[in-house]
Design a protein with these regions (language model features):
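Non-ligating segments of multi-cofactor redox enzymes
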Residues: 1-514
Length: 514
């Protein structure tokens, strides 16, 4: 057992109001500079829709994530080791600027300097790439906002698979939801596996995935390798950049900028302990619908005395273990089973999870317009947002976890309404979904009225425990899955046997050391 800690995030889609405050604040802090005008580390999409960049969920087109071979091993969908190298100078599956959008501003100066004329002056769009005027804006990062555009284009959404999507183009069957997206900081990141320069790495202390700007050579294979398309190429610097999970704030115990400024308070941050030795086994699960359950098995119970003892032996600080015990992410993902990972079928084991939305159709259920199931709760399958659509997005097509989450959320509302409004304690609904009174009351506190310290439980980092990285710095290039230690593979492109890392220690003069 190799115990590691990961700072994860849960987003409660049931409360997202689509205000884009998270996107704007992230943009102002991290990507408001030349070369990154088109990049949004955090963006909010309206679903159904093809998203940003266009059709990012279509891995047959973009070749992101992992695939399982017939021998049970996984490899990047982009290709084998040699297949990735062959694309190093000409990658045919990297998104173009038109797949994102051409960033633009407006000629505001013209409004002040325009000569007197018959018509009111207008501010025409101007490209932020070449500075030329644009005839018209044809796409943007939130072009499909509030179901903008015709349904025929939005119907290309991959989450409509195995569904009769034509019926949802009719007005009376229309549905929508918001989906805030950022880098998933996966346990099994495919961007790391496809980087020829070895510039992308995952930090052991908090699981944040970063790009070493000194080692990045701008091959852009990581952009294709990431199934969520959350790595962007800076055309000014010639380097790739991505969401850094605001690690300077995380290290000091503060939440990310998007979480701090979220108007709807939908974001939760917390620590999860996981067994790194089980990652490959979980990601190599044969059936895609089983990937969610296999990923849950990777996480460890922070209250288990044996886990605590082993974690301390392996150098996990005490404050990290205590934070994991109070983690809202662990409660929602593991205890209550409300939060689900985004597209687990990509086999990257993502660590930004989502609580499926229920609010848009709750009033319809209250009005009695839904058929009742055998119990107290209405039939969740008949609600406005199709369960299969949510399942294709959050559980690889398995409707079971989505139904469980939605039923538990509705049961919580039924119980709290009976207690607060009607003045009675009706436990029929929560008994039906397998929850206790204590669990439901805690769920209500976290989902509805959580305080700042409840939503963000982030341990401060221990810089005094950091090792000297001089020996490894800039010394780990393209290897065949063996880290910085040469290669165990029979075939070696660089014609070298396995090499053990040499620890470089500072040589001090004898008189100096006295």
């Amino acid at each position: 057992m190799k115990i590691r800690s990961q700072v994860g995030m849960v987003l409660n889609l049931d409360k997202c109001i689509g205000c884009h405050t998270c996107s704007v604040t992230c943009k102002n802090v991290w990507t408001g500079r030349e070369g990154m005008e088109y990049a949004w580390f955090n963006n909010v999409e309206t679903k159904p829709g093809i998203g940003y960049p266009k059709n990012w969920e279509d891995q047959e087109e973009w070749q992101g994530g992992w695939v399982r071979d017939v021998n049970g091993k996984i490899r990047p969908r982009l290709g084998s080791k040699m297949g990735v190298i062959t694309k190093i100078f000409a990658n045919p599956v990297v998104p173009q600027i038109d797949d994102y959008y051409e960033p633009f501003t407006f000629d505001y100066e013209h409004l002040h300097n325009a000569p007197e004329g018959k018509h009111i002056p207008t501010a025409r769009p101007r490209s932020l790439i070449d500075g030329k005027r644009m005839d018209k804006v044809i796409w943007g990062p939130n072009w499909e906002e509030l179901l903008g555009g015709e349904f025929e284009k939005r119907a290309r959404d991959r989450n409509f698979e195995a569904m009769q999507k034509e019926m949802y183009g009719q007005f009376e069957n229309t549905f929508m939801m918001y989906l805030p997206r950022l880098c998933e900081h996966c346990l099994n990141p495919s961007c790391v596996a496809t980087c020829p320069s070895g510039a992308i790495y995952k930090r052991e202390e908090d699981g944040i995935v970063l790009i070493d700007q000194d080692k990045c050579r701008g091959w852009r294979l990581c952009i294709s390798g990431c199934p969520y398309k959350k790595i962007y190429f800076n055309w000014k610097s010639g380097k790739s950049e991505k969401c850094i999970f605001c690690y300077p704030r995380i290290e000091s115990g503060q939440p990310t900028v998007c979480s701090e400024t979220c108007v709807g308070r939908i974001r939760y941050l917390g620590v999860l302990l996981y067994d790194a030795d089980r990652i490959e086994e979980a990601a190599s699960t044969e059936r895609e619908v089983d990937l969610y359950e296999r990923q849950c098995e990777v996480f460890l119970d922070p209250h288990d005395p044996s886990v605590i003892e082993e974690a301390l032996k392996q150098g996990i600080p005490q404050n990290v273990i205590e934070a994991a015990q109070r983690s809202p992410v662990y409660k929602m993902a593991m205890d209550w089973k409300l939060a689900l990972p985004l597209h687990p079928e990509y086999r990257t084991l993502p660590m930004v999870w989502y609580v499926p939305p229920l609010s848009p159709i709750q009033s319809y259920a209250d009005a009695g317009g839904l058929p009742k199931s055998e119990g107290v709760l209405p039939a969740i399958e008949s609600l406005r947002i199709p369960v299969q659509y949510l399942a294709n997005m959050l559980s690889a097509g398995d409707t079971g976890p989505v139904l469980r989450a939605l039923k538990r959320m509705m049961a919580m509302r039924h119980y709290m309404r009976s207690q607060i409004v009607e003045g009675v304690t009706d436990t029929r609904a929560i008994d039906e979904v397998g929850l206790s009174v204590a669990q439901v009351e805690e769920m209500y506190r976290y989902l509805a009225i959580a305080n700042y310290e409840d939503r963000f439980v982030i341990p401060t980092s221990h810089r005094e425990m950091a090792g000297d990285a001089f020996a490894e710095r800039n010394g780990c290039g393209f290897t065949f899955g063996d880290g910085c230690h040469g290669s165990d593979s029979k075939f070696n492109l660089f014609n070298s046997s396995r090499i053990d890392a040499i620890n470089i220690t500072e040589v001090r003069d004898k008189a100096e050391g006295e």
